[in-house]
Amino acid sequence: MTENNEKVKNSDSANNQSSKNSKFNFNFEDKKVKCAKTILIIIFLAFLSFQMRAQTADMGFTTNEQYLDVFSDDNGRMYLTALDPYYYLRMSENYLENGHTGDTLKNIDGQQVPWDSYKYGPTGARATFNLLSVVTVWVYQVWHAMDSTVTLMNAAFWVPAILSMFLITPIFFTVRRITSSDIGGAVAAILASLSPSIFVKTVAGFSDTPILEILPLLFIVWFIIEAIHYSKEKNYKSLIYGLLATLMLALYPFMWSAWWYGYYIVIAFLVIYAIYKGISYNSIAKYTKSKNNNHKDKIESEKLEMLNILKISGLFIIGGAVLITALYGVSTTMNALQAPLNYLGLDEVSSQTGWPNVLTTVSELDTASLDEIISSSLGSIHLFAIGLIGIFLSLFRKVLTPVKQISNGLAEKLDIKYALLLIIWFAVTFLAASKGVRFVALMVPPLSIGVGIFVGFIEQFIKNNLDKKYEYVAYPTIAIIVLYALFTIYRADSADLVRMLLPSNYVPIAEGIMLASLAVLIIYKVAELIAESNKKLVMNKIFMILLAIGLITPTIATIVPFYSVPTYNDGWGESLEWINTQTPNNSVVTCWWDNGHIYTWKTDRMVTFDGSSQNTPRAYWVGRAFSTSNESLANGIFRMLASSGDKAYTTDSVLIKKTGSIKNTVDVLNEILPLTKSDAQKALKNSSYKFTDTEVSEILDATHPKVTNPDYLITYNRMTSIASVWSYFGNWDFNLPAGTSRSEREAGSFQGLQTYATNINDTLIVRSLIQQTAEYNIYTLIEVRNETLTGAMMAVTNDGQMQTQQLNMHKVKLMVNENGKSKMYNSLADPDGQLSLLIKVDKNSIIGTDGSNNPVYSSSSWMATANLEDSVYSKLHFFDGEGLDTIKLEKESLDPTANGVQPGFKVFSVDYGNYSK
């Protein structure tokens, strides 16, 4: 036993003796008592995690009952939030109904494989097994057995909150193993569970995989640390924990496709640490042999530890690879070798395929700044810094090593194992976070463990040095931290202090268990403090509790209250239900990819692409169809995608092989898709590429197929807001170098304007605010009199002075609805203008009168970049398909998710016409 360990042992013995000689006969150091306390801590932390996430169910984002009804089911239970949860909800429905995650089985190489017919229509894709769907079905079956009104969506809503309860266990025990501190483990567990980047994507309602991306690695690290801890003992504990880590690794691919990152972190640690222990053992052995020192037992202990570490390393590295290969196939293992290189290319503008890289516009994959990484990890730079300090402090554990200055040939040195693992873990995840804000959550566990180590180190340091004066520095420091925490709460919202203790009462039993376990722990701690005869130790324990409160309170304050508005709603549901009941089963829904998972779930119809297939050539084609003003081209694109998918431009297609490039293939397709089949045939035969008759026939089978699938388009208000994204891809210039920045490429956009429309003396007057400053406002003033449209710009100062000038818009487009009919007015105002004005006035909807009793009409207007003024999307969403011959508005309903037109969720049918003639 080393001197340091003797000191700790003596201190613990003193504490034990103090407890036994206390005012009570109750022994707080009894193993059963400690075990019960640990169980209570775990229960409290687990239900605290659950309760914080239950806040979303309270639907506190509004008090409007009508608005609440739109975002909840018939039983008042909130819909799922975000987008991806609806994919897993559909997979859960398939698993419940079919026993696998596909909606059907497909014969591939003689095997019946679960198949998802709806995603990436009409091709479909293999349906992969996922643990989230299994857990969702389990929760549903248990809950539905008790309450028949429970739906699968209701069960899915609570799955992330339930799974989050398991986050705290590995974090708590990892920190306690390193520091022997319960309070340090509790702080780390709370910070990890409630950190912003993890919390927002694991709240109730966000039934997605982020929780499963983190959870397995936490258990793997905990088991590896336990395996290393027992590596000096002559028992099987070390190998048992190593086996548990390996088995958890084998489950990881079920939960996340990027499982390999955790595998590489642990491999790096085990390899480096095994090498280090080998060098250390040889050094000790050689030194003691040369000095003829009698340290046989210690040398044997070092040897045993080294051999066990080698066994653990082999079991995890080789055994893990074998298990994963056996369970998932060689391709999964081989993909893990290539995956890190693919990850490093996330921010490339153009993918290696030659098509634009959609991932560059996915917000959660935006490159994160250092400030964003720090604020999104633990919530503040202070906790971030404390986490790093804690990782450094994990070095301060002692092990034996030979030094010539010590007479017995052996001395103590820093133990690197915990610091080594945490440093590797932090470094890898920090690199990941720098590549995209989505990955900041991966960095939270090592930082949280670092904070827990910091707390545990402070606790042990003061406890082991009660006879010194360190408390005169430590206690004021802790007091400052507590005061800072209280100031943070006050600055945020002092009215929410009660809600920090009672964040949600939506699940009374969970609230009761959390409060009951907390009450018992408080009683236990108060009794322990009263029983303690060592007053300095009492002060130490009190100040450590205050330190813990001071560290976790600001984080809790930032997430209480917390609300999240669902994306899906009854307005959308009305139109999607129409698709489900009124369209053929082979119909395809085409829209931008973001809502694709919702559409497949609700309509039971194929979609062109969705959140799992956004980074494909279809981003260009769908963007092209919506941004072009050529209706025939848009129609041809919709027909091709809905009926033959990617067949025309796959890597083994005639066009790619014959033209030699994606650019040339795109040029040919843009030329022939607007044409009838006979005209397209002529164009191909006259092409400089000299296509043979067979090749022409194969191309036309893809672009002008004999058998087509009906296509239905969806537009919605948020699609207006993200026009700069889909038009960016739709206007992609393949002639530009692959690395051309986004600012150098063409895109378009829309901006909603405040609009006022009235009728004065038989003149329709529409005023739109286009610029607002502290001194003046600028409006566009559009008038329609005697079927003639005129316009001007008008500046109005704060004191009422007005100045008019010529309208500098490229074009003004105005649609007036009256008596069930629509009339379009078009005016080219300024040929050199870069912006256009799109206006819609509904004379059938009078929303009030002005001071002269003139009617005020429902109206809306948008500023559009000139390249989108006549786009298919503009005609669809703003003007209900007016001006289009082959695309017809079929259904429209409320869209409460974003500002814009109402009804703002629209469904259109596409008539392919006589394309085949």
From Swiss-Prot:
This protein's pathway: Cell surface structure biogenesis; S-layer biogenesis; Protein modification; protein glycosylation
Chain residue ranges for the region called Interacts with target acceptor peptide in protein substrate: 592-594
Binding of a glycophospholipid, residues: R438
Residue ranges, Extracellular side: 60-154, 204-209, 261-263, 330-372, 435-438, 491-506, 563-917
Sequence motif: DXD motif 1, positions: 82-84
Residue stretches spanning the membrane: 39-59, 155-175, 183-203, 210-230, 238-260, 264-286, 309-329, 373-393, 414-434, 439-459, 470-490, 507-527, 542-562
Source organism superkingdom: Archaea
Primary site of residence: membrane
Residue ranges with Basic and acidic residues bias: 1-10
Reaction catalysed by this enzyme: an archaeal dolichyl phosphooligosaccharide + [protein]-L-asparagine = an archaeal dolichyl phosphate + a glycoprotein with the oligosaccharide chain attached by N-beta-D-glycosyl linkage to a protein L-asparagine
Keywords assigned by UniProt, alphabetized: Cell membrane, Glycosyltransferase, Magnesium, Manganese, Membrane, Metal-binding, Transferase, Transmembrane, Transmembrane helix
Cellular location(s): Cell membrane
Positions on the Cytoplasmic side per record topology: 1-38, 176-182, 231-237, 287-308, 394-413, 460-469, 528-541
Motif (TIXE motif): 361-364
Enzyme class: transferase
Residues binding Mn(2+), per UniProt: D84, D208, E364
Matching PANTHER family: DOLICHYL-DIPHOSPHOOLIGOSACCHARIDE--PROTEIN GLYCOSYLTRANSFERASE SUBUNIT, DOLICHYL-DIPHOSPHOOLIGOSACCHARIDE--PROTEIN GLYCOSYLTRANSFERASE SUBUNIT STT3B
Purpose of the protein: Oligosaccharyl transferase (OST) that catalyzes the initial transfer of a defined glycan (ManNAcGlc-2,3-diNAcAGlcNAc in M.voltae) from the lipid carrier dolichol-monophosphate to an asparagine residue within an Asn-X-Ser/Thr consensus motif in nascent polypeptide chains, the first step in protein N-glycosylation. Involved in the assembly of an N-linked disaccharide that decorates the S-layer glycoprotein and flagellins.
Name by which UniProt lists this protein: Dolichyl-phosphooligosaccharide-protein glycotransferase
Source organism of the structure: Methanococcus voltae
Lineage, broadest ranks: Archaea, Methanobacteriati, Methanobacteriota, Methanomada group, Methanococci
